[in-house]
Structures are given as structure tokens and as C-alpha cells.
Amino acid sequence: MDSSSNVHPVTIRRDTIIRENNLPVIAELQDETQPNNSPQKSRKRNLFNTDIRTMAKDNPFFAEASKVIAGKLEVKDADNRRMILNYCEHLRTSYTTKDIDFLRQVFSDQALIVVGNVVRAAGKQGATGIEGDEKVTFSLKTKKEYLARLEMVFAANKKIDVKFTDFRIMRHPTMEGIYGVSMKQKYTSDRYSDEGYLFILWDFRDKSMPLIHVRTWQPAASVNDDKEIIGIRDFNLE
């Protein structure tokens, strides 16, 4: 019997998340999808458990791991947060190892994915993906559309590196098992680089199959203070 059948799906009211300014996006560049002729090595997926007890202080997950170790959280909440730390680390490495199978597994079929393209004026090359009068264009993508484009990005780049900082876990105030995770992300590939704020809405109600319902990204240059960073309270969940 499929245990997920007893879990009610999360419905996200999409008309509440798109803002007039400072739109959340997933950063992608049009020219980043052009093929790279370098041969790609196949990589085996390896889901692992991070030992939070031995985590170094410079690890981006250290502050949140310390809350779990302190023993002041409810047992179920602590277990969920421990799982989030493991899954977020594997999510990060799934981009660097081009593990499209893992991404296909964790994104909900109804995931809200807002895709952004950084459009630069001719002759400009910003180090962080947005600069001066550069613009970001936006469009909604289905899971299928997003992963198909991501496969093109993986094929076009020999190396992709993703680093996290300012990692925070937010528990939904009324829906058990629903968590928001925000972090600052630095993305670097052969053809493109950017820095911005990433938000992920995780559903851990079925522990055998955690799902991502939302992923958003905001260019760092467009955020003036912490209040403008997308968080769990920016979504109406039903």
C-alpha cells in the first residue's frame, strides 16, 4: 500500500506569490543551454546521511544543526530538521553531479517553479548575474518543462558548482511536516554565474518520499533588506 495516499496534497494559491517588484525566480540563462561537446561522465546517485554532531562551524548548515543537537526541540520536529539537512545537502550536490533522477524524484508533480532569465545589455558581463540596467524576465514552468531545460543546462556545462550560506529552516505554524528553507546561493558554471536567495518549500509528511512544492530564487542585487527575502509566510497553503 502506498503510504503517500493518506497524505493530503498541498495546494498553493499561485496568485499570491508573484509580486510586482522583486519577483522570485530560478536563475537560468538562455545561452547556458547550448551544448558543450565535452564528454559527460555518468555518476551514481548516493544518498547519504550527514553526521551533524561532527559538523564544522564553517559548514553552512552548522547553526541549524546546533539547534537539533541542543535537544530543545520536539522529537518529531528535530527528526524532520535532521532529515531536511540531509536532503538539502543532497539537493545541492545533485546540481554539481547532474543527478537529474534525484531532482525528478523530489520535485512535486504540481511544483510551483518560477523561472527567470537574466538579460544583459550588449557588451556587459556581470560577475553575479545581474548588474546596473540588466533585466530579469520571468515565466512559470511545470516540473516537466523545468527538468527538461535543466538537462540541457547539465549537457551544456562540464562543471557546475553550488555553494550555500545563511541557511535557515522555518517550520510552518499550523501544517505539521511542512517546512520552508531559505539560503543564499552562489551558482557557478562554465557559461554563467550568479548569487541570490533561494527558497524551498519542503513537505516531509511522508518521510519515505519528501517533496519540494516550491522553489524560488531572487537575485542578491535586487534585495535591499531581509524583509524582501521570500519566505514561508509569502505562500497561502490550503
Predicted regions and their residues:
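Signal peptide processing junction and immediate N-terminal pro/mature segment
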Residues: 1-9
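Coil residues (strongly favoring Ser/Thr
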Residues: 3, 15-16
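Low-complexity, intrinsically disordered terminal/linker segments enriched in charged
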Residues: 15, 23, 42-44, 53, ...
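Short beta-strand and adjacent turn/loop elements
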Residues: 20-21, 32-38, 107-109, 176-181, ...
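Short, low-complexity N-terminal intrinsically disordered segments enriched in polar/charged residues
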Residues: 22, 29-32, 39, 43-101, ...
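Short, solvent-exposed secondary-structure junction/capping segments
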Residues: 89-93, 105-132
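Loop/turn elements at helix/coil->beta-strand transitions in domains of secreted/extracellular proteins
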Residues: 100, 160, 207-209
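Surface-exposed, charged secondary-structure patches
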Residues: 127-193
